A protein has these predicted regions:
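Active-site beta->alpha N-cap acidic-glycine motif
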Residues: 135-237, 243-265, 357
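N-terminal pre-catalytic segment of deacetylase/amide-hydrolase enzymes
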Residues: 45-175, 182-187, 195, 350-359
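Serine residues within intrinsically disordered or low-complexity segments
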Residues: 10-13, 19, 32, 44, ...
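N-terminal secretory signal peptides that target proteins for export/translocation
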Residues: 1-25
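Catalytic domains of cell-wall/extracellular-matrix polysaccharide-remodeling enzymes
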Residues: 102, 188, 210-211, 234-359
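Short stretches within intrinsically disordered, low-complexity N-terminal or propeptide regions
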Residues: 10, 36-38, 78-82
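Alpha/beta-hydrolase fold active-site neighborhood
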Residues: 30, 56, 230
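Sec-dependent N-terminal signal peptides of Gram-positive bacterial secreted proteins and lipoproteins
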Residues: 27-48
Length: 359
C-alpha cells in the first residue's frame, strides 16, 4: 500500500515538473515575441525624418499620407511655419511660400523732414541707372569689376537698406521684372518660371493692378513677390511730398482694394530707376525696402528686339555673385530665352532665389 502511495506521489511530482517546464517555455516564448515587436517598432521609428527648424529652410516634416483635399494646404502651411530664424521664405511643393510681416510706416511721424530735404541726384549718377558693371569670363568664371558707384553713394544706399546687389560671396542671382505686363507674354513667362521652379519679383503699377488682377493673383499663387512701382510711373525724384504719397501709398491702397487677401507689400522700385536720397529716405519712412538692380540690358524696345543667342551670351558675360537682374516682360527676346537663361545660370553653379533672401 505504501508502495502505491509513494508511486502516486512520485507520478504527481513528475506531472507538476513537466507543467512548470511547459509554463516556463510558454512564458519565454511570450517574452521573445514581445522583444521582437519592440525591436521592430524601434527600427520603424528610425526611418521617420523630422526636421529641426534650425536645420534649414524648406525641409519638410515627413508626414503620414494626407488626403488629396488637404495635402497641399498642409504642406504650404508647414513650409510657412518653418520660415523662421529670421527667414521669411521657404520652398514646398515646387514653389516658394512666404511669411511676410506687416510693413511698418512709423516713419510717417517724422514726414516733415521731407519738405526741406534736397532732391538733388547722386553726383555719380549718369543718365541711366546702373550701380556698376562687371564682366565675367565664361571659361574660367572669373569676374572683373569694371566700375562701381562712389563710396558716398554706396554708403547712402546702405543707410536706407537699398538693394542693388546681394551677397557678393555667394553664387546667387535674383530675377526681377518691371512694367510691360500687358503685352501678352505673362502666361508664357509664368509657365516657364513654374516649370523651372523659380521665384521672381514683379514690380507693378496702377494700370496693371486695375486691368490684370487675375495675372497678379496667379503670380502670388505660384510663389512670386509683388513689389510697388507707383501708380503712374512718374519720375519721383522731384515731386512734392503729397504726390509721392499719392503715387506710392496710392498703389498699395489700390492693390489691397483689388486683392484684399494679398500678402504684405514690402519692396519698392522707383519708376525707371530714377532715384536720389530723398526717394530712398521717403520710401524707408513708409516701411519699404527699395530694390534697384546690378544688371540689365536694353530689352524694352519692342520694335528692336535683340537676338536670343546674343542676349544669352550677354547675360552670361554679366553674371556675377549677388546679381539683381532687371528684365522687362514686354520683350519677346526675354520671353523666348527665359528657360534657357535659367538653365545656363544654374549650369554656371548659381542659385536663383527670391529677393527676400537678401538680408
Amino acid at each position: 500500500m505504501l508502495y502505491f502511495i509513494f508511486e502516486a506521489i512520485s507520478f504527481n511530482s513528475t506531472i507538476r515538473e513537466k507543467s512548470l517546464k511547459t509554463y516556463i517555455n510558454y512564458k519565454t516564448l511570450l517574452y521573445s515575441v514581445a522583444l521582437a515587436l519592440i525591436l521592430a517598432c524601434l527600427s520603424s521609428c528610425k526611418n521617420e525624418v523630422v526636421s529641426n527648424p534650425g536645420d534649414g529652410i524648406g525641409r519638410e516634416r515627413v508626414q503620414p499620407r494626407e488626403t488629396t483635399e488637404t495635402s497641399k494646404e498642409t504642406k504650404a502651411e508647414t513650409a510657412a511655419d518653418n520660415a523662421s530664424d529670421g527667414k521669411i521664405w521657404a520652398f514646398a511643393d515646387g514653389k516658394y511660400v512666404f511669411n511676410f510681416p506687416e510693413r511698418s510706416d512709423e516713419g510717417l511721424a517724422t514726414i516733415d523732414e521731407m519738405y526741406d530735404m534736397s532732391t538733388a541726384r547722386f553726383d555719380d549718377q549718369p543718365d541711366d541707372w546702373f550701380f556698376g558693371k562687371t564682366v565675367r569670363d565664361n571659361d574660367t568664371g572669373e569676374v572683373t569689376y569694371v566700375w562701381d558707384r562712389s563710396a558716398d553713394t554706396l554708403e547712402t544706399l546702405k543707410k536706407y537698406r537699398t538693394i542693388y546687389r546681394g551677397d557678393e560671396t555667394r553664387k546667387v542671382c535674383y530675377l526681377t521684372f518691371d512694367c510691360g505686363y500687358e503685352y501678352g507674354t505673362m502666361d508664357t513667362i509664368l509657365d516657364t518660371l513654374k516649370e523651372k521652379q523659380v521665384s521672381a519679383t514683379f514690380f507693378v503699377n496702377g494700370h496693371y493692378v486695375r486691368s490684370a488682377s487675375d495675372k497678379i493673383q496667379r503670380m502670388i499663387d505660384e510663389g512670386h513677390i509683388i513689389g510697388n512701382h507707383a501708380v503712374n510711373h512718374y519720375d519721383l525724384t522731384g515731386v512734392s511730398v503729397d504726390t509721392f504719397l499719392e503715387e506710392v501709398q496710392g498703389l498699395e491702397e489700390l492693390y489691397y482694394e483689388t486683392l484684399p487677401d494679398a500678402p504684405p507689400m514690402l519692396y519698392f522700385r522707383p519708376p525707371s530707376g530714377d532715384c536720389n536720397e530723398w526717394v530712398l529716405k521717403f520710401a524707408d519712412k513708409l516701411g519699404y525696402r527699395t530694390v534697384m538692380w546690378s544688371w540689365a540690358y536694353k530689352d524694352f524696345d519692342t520694335d528692336a528686339q535683340p537676338d536670343v543667342d546674343e542676349t544669352l551670351e550677354k547675360v552670361m558675360t554679366g553674371l556675377h555673385n549677388g546679381e539683381v537682374m532687371l528684365l522687362h516682360p514686354e520683350s519677346k527676346t526675354n520671353t523666348e530665352m527665359l528657360g534657357k537663361m535659367i538653365d545656363k545660370i544654374r549650369d554656371a553653379g548659381f542659385e536663383i532665389l527670391p529677393i527676400c533672401d537678401i538680408e
